[in-house]
Amino acid sequence: MAVTTYIVDKDGNQANAASVTKPSDRHFRGAWTLDGSVIAEDLATAKEIFKDKIREVRKPLLEAEDVVYMKALEADDATAKTNSVNKKKALRDAPAAKAITDAKTIAELKAAWDTSVLGASPYA
């Protein structure tokens, strides 16, 4: 008895995995939509997944920056406090980046990862 694997898209549609064209990676698996025998990625849903990934990555970065700020506060180091505040603002603003909003393709969305703020891209 052969086992058949089915792929289910974000809307609950399903197709035989052996008979569909799939995206090259699974980064935005939650954004997959079935269009005949092709699995496409819904860009709006992919953008939300992308923003959630940013939030996941920035959480420990914000926590670490809180420590930097507290040390600067204790040392009364105005420059370090300003730098820390600016870095935390950049981290908080990362999900609202214009490059994410303006992305028209999945490739553009992946390229919107700001390595200067968030570090290495999980999409590289």
Question: What are these regions, as identified by a protein language model?
Answer:
Residues 1-124:
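A preference for well-ordered globular domain cores
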